[in-house]
């Protein structure tokens, strides 16, 4: 058993979801001393090393309280996100703002609140869970919000470098979780994604491409736009009405 997280204090946002639960459990398996399982409505856990923590990404006061309540965190997993059914880039602006408030502003809000905590604990690690949707032509607020979060992750890596914080972006296509159940497409397991994420924490990677589709997509990104985007449209036919 790998023990790459021996003694670390981990905080996972969105800990109630399928991917979040894997982040909590694998952190324990890898030797974490404490795991804050953060969610809007936290649930109980069967391991005393897990500390349920109330955290609503869309509420600045809630995020501040969470940072105050978890002063020993040295590994922050920014995992929480939403992908509403019927989301469309030309849909109601209120819905678009709701997606961005969680997936972009919420992600950045948590990173900013915990940056001083990470600095106080030796720099630590920030891992943002992104999506291959950041690089594709899905006409959704979700894809646009993940593109913004990808850019913010790279900016945070530069911004927090001086305090010794290691910033990782994880990009992946479809994960086999309840959030993706409505799509009948190939999916990678949550366990595999989380294992790759924690391996990246241990080896110092900047970026994790967590499935074959995302790795292939990254290899195509230098293709001229006139070829790349029609190809993407063809690949994504099952997602776009």
Segments and roles (model prediction):
Residues 47-60:
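Rossmann-fold cofactor-recognition segment
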Residues 87-97:
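Substrate-binding pocket helix/loop in short-chain dehydrogenase/reductase
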Residues 111, 145-148:
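Active-site helix of classical SDR
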Residues 131:
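Residue(s) in the substrate-gating loop at a strand-loop-helix junction
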């Amino acid at each position: 058993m790998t023990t790459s997280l021996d003694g670390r204090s981990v905080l996972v946002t969105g800990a109630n979801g399928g991917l979040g639960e894997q982040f909590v459990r694998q952190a324990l398996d890898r030797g974490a001393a404490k795991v804050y399982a953060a969610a809007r409505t936290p649930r109980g856990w069967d391991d005393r090393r897990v500390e349920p923590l109330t955290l609503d990404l869309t509420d600045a006061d809630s995020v501040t309280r969470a940072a105050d309540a978890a002063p020993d965190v040295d590994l922050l997993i920014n995992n929480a996100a939403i992908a509403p059914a019927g989301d469309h880039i030309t849909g109601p602006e209120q819905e678009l703002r709701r997606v961005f408030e969680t997936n972009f502003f919420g992600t950045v809000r948590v990173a900013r609140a915990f940056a001083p905590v990470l600095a106080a604990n030796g720099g630590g690690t920030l891992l943002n869970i992104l999506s291959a949707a950041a690089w594709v032509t899905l006409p959704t607020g979700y894809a646009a919000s993940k593109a913004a979060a990808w850019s913010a992750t790279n900016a945070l890596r530069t911004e927090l470098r001086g305090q010794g914080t290691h910033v990782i972006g994880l990009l992946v296509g479809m994960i086999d979780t309840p959030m993706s159940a409505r799509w009948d497409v190939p999916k990678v397991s949550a366990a595999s994604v989380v294992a790759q994420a924690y391996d990246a924490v241990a080896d110092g990677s900047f970026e994790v491409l967590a499935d074959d589709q995302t790795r292939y997509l990254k290899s195509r990104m230098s293709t001229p736009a006139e070829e790349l985007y029609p190809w993407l449209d063809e690949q994504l036919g099952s997602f776009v009405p």
